[in-house]
């Protein structure tokens, strides 16, 4: 497989998971669109590693590999296809590599919501720093917004297992609903760089739709007009 085909495969994989992006990428500056999709594809890799089911050892090994790869990007070398688009960006890749091991700890059960956010603080801060280097100065509490989006993704992927101990009282569905409400309260709207704000608007809409269903991890079809409206507002900040 050629490098170009391998890169397209990773980008298409992310687009297939976020098909609504086709409606929203118009709100991202044209010169930033390719980089944004490549970056979000990498972020999705980290989310998948965090939310792995079963034996975590292969995921942990993959995380260690990514740490080495990101440090190579700092040295202007790359092996992964995504590096074709991302490695040339002068971003703090080493800072992100240093934060990746925190995902091991973030995967473990937490006592409360504060602890869940704290476990992701360094990782989210490193991602916010990379995004600032890529797309310009962020708005608002960029790192906190990223952490909230990661936890919302984890809520949908891991179910009751992700709930902090203080949120596991009584019925599982009710507990999931209650913690989703807490995450939404702590998720700053329209924070971060423009591409992140647009993606977060989509992620938040999905999260709210999943929360509204009786099957908590099921996602109802999102209404295109409403989604475009949210994307436009997010882009404007």
What is each stretch, according to the model?
Residues 154-160:
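Conserved, surface-exposed functional patches that form binding/active-site neighborhoods
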Residues 101-113:
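Acidic/His metal-coordination segments adjacent to aromatic residues that form catalytic metal sites
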Residues 89-93:
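Long, charge-dense
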Residues 1-68, 72-84, 96, 100, ...:
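Catalytic cores of Mg2+-dependent Asp-rich isoprenoid enzymes
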């Amino acid at each position: 497989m050629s490098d170009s085909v391998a890169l397209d495969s990773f980008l298409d994989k992310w687009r297939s998971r976020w098909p609504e992006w086709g409606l929203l990428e118009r709100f991202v500056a044209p010169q930033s669109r390719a980089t944004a999709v490549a970056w979000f594809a990498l972020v999705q890799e980290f989310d998948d590693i965090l939310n792995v089911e079963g034996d975590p050892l292969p995921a942990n090994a993959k995380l260690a590999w990514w740490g080495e790869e990101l440090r190579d990007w700092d040295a202007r070398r790359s092996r992964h296809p995504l590096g074709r688009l991302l490695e040339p960006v002068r971003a703090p890749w080493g800072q992100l590599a240093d934060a990746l091991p925190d995902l091991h700890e973030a995967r473990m059960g937490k006592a409360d919501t504060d602890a869940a956010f704290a476990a992701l603080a360094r990782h989210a801060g490193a991602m916010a720093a990379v995004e600032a280097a890529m797309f310009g100065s962020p708005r608002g509490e960029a790192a906190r917004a990223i952490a909230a989006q990661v936890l919302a993704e984890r809520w949908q992927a891991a179910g009751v297992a992700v709930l902090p101990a203080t949120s596991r009282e009584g019925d599982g569905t009710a507990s999931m609903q209650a913690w989703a409400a807490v995450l939404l309260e702590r998720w700053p709207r329209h924070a971060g760089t423009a591409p992140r704000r647009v993606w977060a608007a989509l992620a938040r809409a999905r999260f709210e739709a999943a929360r509204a269903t009786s099957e908590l991890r099921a996602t109802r079809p999102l209404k295109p007009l409403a989604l475009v409206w949210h994307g436009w507002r997010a882009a404007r900040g």
